[in-house]
Structure formats: C-alpha cells, structure tokens
Amino acid sequence: ASPQQLQRINKLELVVETIPLTEVWLRGPKFVDQPDLADSAVSHRRYGDMGVHYAFGTDNKPYSPFATLWAAVARTERGTGTVLGPEQRLSRMDALRAFTMGGAYFCFEEDRRGSIEVGKLADMAVLSDDLLQMPEGYIPDLNSVLTLVGGEVTHQTTDF
C-alpha cells in the first residue's frame, strides 16, 4: 500500500488483515528482482509507523501461525533466500502483537482478549521454545504444547 493509501486507511479507522506467509514466501519470487515492489508488499513496519492497525491471518497452506509469524520477521523468499523489503521486517514482539492484540482489535474484542490482563479471557498458549530468543530459522517449527481458551485447556501435548 502506498503512504497515501495508508493515510486513508488510518483516517477511515480501518484494520488491515494480511497473511505474510502468502505474500512473502509463496508469492515472493515475483518480488526478487523488484525491490520497490517487495518493499510495498505487506509493509507492516510502515503500517505501524503510520499508526495503521493490522492483524495476521493464516488461511493458506502451509497453515501455521508460526510460519506466518516467521515470514513477517524474516521476509525471506523461499527460492533464493532473498530478504524482501528488509526495512519492513518486524521484530518478533511486533509480529506476535499482530496475532494477539491485532487480532483482538480486528474482531472488536480488544477489551476481552488479545493480552493477558485482569478481567480478560485467559486465551494463551505455552510454546515449545522461546520465540523471542530462539534462532530465527526455527520459528516455523514452533508449536503449542498447551493452549487455553477462556481459561480452559483446549490442547495439551502428551509430554507437557
């Protein structure tokens, strides 16, 4: 999106939902030789800098929120390993926020979910590794060993 489009999105108080894995990893080859186009493809850093609210989705194969999160952090094209629009890479915390608080805001439920606070639903996951400290290339291999929705266990691995 252009800066003018993002200004308009912000003025209209819209929320942008994107699937970084689709745009950067699956559709990445078309951006390899077009750095300007790569920079504008799901330019999350620019969204945040301009105050645009955004959230991540995962409705495409491979279905993995962690692969999607990795795509926003690494922005690596799958065939060549080229980093597409490196200045648009997100920190791990910003990418995590897009799934949690961004998703809640997208659904008009930011007062009920999206962060762990008193009075909110206890929706959370315990991950198989430390997202903030692990090597970047292993982020797609993360999985949930325990998931709670509304404070109730909905998933638990046998070894947790």
Residue ranges and their predicted role:
Residues D159-F160:
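Residue-level structural signal for beta-strand termini and adjacent loop
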Residues Q7-L14, T18-Q133, G137, L142, ...:
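His/Asp/Glu-enriched, well-ordered alpha-helical/loop segment
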